[in-house]
């Protein structure tokens, strides 16, 4: 699937909760879970488009979940149905779902849930448990239960699910594969837990990006084989290859 640049119309742009929005575009898009698009709704400022993960896709539309964290995403959050938006993608390697089988744990935190919901939807032949951690109750995983065997929530304030961190009750030895996305400190812990139990883990890296096509090297990640670009060789990497910060 080759990336392409197109000008589309916003179908809907819904506020999911404080600071979190879901933007949808009508059309049929050939995408893989874990891939992303560059979104842009301005001409000059800010300079860069914004890399946003695919939250859902079907025969009718594609949806993106994003957090408002700066000028670019603030502009995106103000878009209305019918407004123009420029998109480039799909970008990145994504998850190869055909190679994942058996009992699977998806472990994610914060806005890192965005690519993992669409991943869960596509793991049709797997037995999936979905671990999601937040600071407080979140609506971003409201639709994931229909895709998984069990949804296991954790919140730091105890507003829903386990009070604490998403890794507290996670036992990697119970799974054939672990798939993870979220804050780097969380991913570091998940990788270490999986290494101790000899369970393969795939990590979807969240990195700042500029060009999205591998030219600028802004999004490089440290790996045991040297630096790799999250936008080209990633964002999905085998956890044992990465050098993460704890």
Swiss-Prot record:
Any one GO MF annotation of this record? oxidoreductase activity
- Annotated GO biological process: 'de novo' UMP biosynthetic process
Going by the entry's taxonomy, the superkingdom of the source organism is recorded as Bacteria
Cofactor requirement: [2Fe-2S] cluster; FAD
- Domain named FAD-binding FR-type is located at 3-97
Annotated residues for binding of [2Fe-2S] cluster: 211, 216, 219, 231
Entries under SUPFAM superfamilies matching the protein = Ferredoxin reductase-like, C-terminal NADP-linked domain (SSF52343), Riboflavin synthase domain-like (SSF63380)
Could you list this entry's UniProt keywords, alphabetically sorted.
Answer: 2Fe-2S, Electron transport, FAD, Flavoprotein, Iron, Iron-sulfur, Metal-binding, Pyrimidine biosynthesis, Transport
Which residues hold FAD? Answer: 50-53, 72-73
Task: Quote any Pfam family the record assigns.
Answer: DHODB_Fe-S_bind
InterPro entries given in the database record: Cyt_c3_hydrogenase_gsu, Dihydroorotate_DH_ele_sf, Dihydroorotate_DH_Fe-S-bd, Dihydroorotate_DHASE_ETsu, FAD-bd_FR_type, FNR_nucleotide-bd, PyrK_electron_transfer, Riboflavin_synthase-like_b-brl
The pathway this protein participates in, as annotated, is:
Pyrimidine metabolism; UMP biosynthesis via de novo pathway; orotate from (S)-dihydroorotate (NAD(+) route): step 1/1
What does the record note about the cofactor?
Binds 1 [2Fe-2S] cluster per subunit. Binds 1 FAD per subunit.
Role of this protein: Responsible for channeling the electrons from the oxidation of dihydroorotate from the FMN redox center in the PyrD type B subunit to the ultimate electron acceptor NAD(+).
Assigned protein family: Belongs to the PyrK family.
Q: How does it assemble?
A: Heterotetramer of 2 PyrK and 2 PyrD type B subunits.
What PANTHER family does its record include? DIHYDROOROTATE DEHYDROGENASE B (NAD(+)), ELECTRON TRANSFER SUBUNIT, DIHYDROOROTATE DEHYDROGENASE B (NAD(+)), ELECTRON TRANSFER SUBUNIT-RELATED
Descriptive protein name: Dihydroorotate dehydrogenase B (NAD(+)), electron transfer subunit
């Amino acid at each position: 699937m080759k990336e392409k640049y197109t000008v589309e119309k916003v179908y809907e742009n819904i506020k999911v909760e404080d600071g979190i929005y879901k933007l949808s575009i009508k059309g049929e898009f050939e995408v893989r879970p874990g891939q992303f698009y560059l979104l842009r709704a301005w001409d000059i400022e800010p300079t860069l488009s914004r890399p946003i993960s695919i939250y859902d896709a079907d025969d009718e539309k594609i949806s993106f979940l994003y957090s408002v964290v700066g000028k670019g995403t603030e502009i995106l959050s103000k878009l209305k149905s019918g407004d123009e938006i420029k998109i480039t993608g799909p970008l990145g390697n994504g998850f190869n779902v055909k190679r994942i089988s058996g009992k699977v744990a998806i472990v994610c935190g914060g806005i890192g849930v965005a690519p993992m919901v669409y991943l869960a939807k596509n793991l049709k032949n797997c037995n999936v448990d979905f671990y999601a951690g937040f600071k407080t109750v979140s609506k971003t995983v409201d639709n994931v239960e229909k895709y998984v065997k069990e949804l296991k929530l954790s919140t730091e304030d105890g507003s829903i699910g386990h009070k604490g961190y998403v890794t507290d009750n996670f036992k990697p030895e119970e799974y054939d594969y672990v798939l993870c996305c979220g804050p780097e400190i969380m991913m570091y812990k998940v990788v270490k837990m999986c290494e101790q139990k000899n369970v393969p883990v795939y990590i979807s890296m969240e990195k700042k990006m500029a060009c999205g096509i591998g030219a600028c090297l802004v999004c490089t990640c440290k790996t045991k084989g040297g630096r790799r670009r999250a936008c080209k060789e990633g964002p999905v990497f085998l956890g044992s290859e990465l050098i993460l910060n704890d």
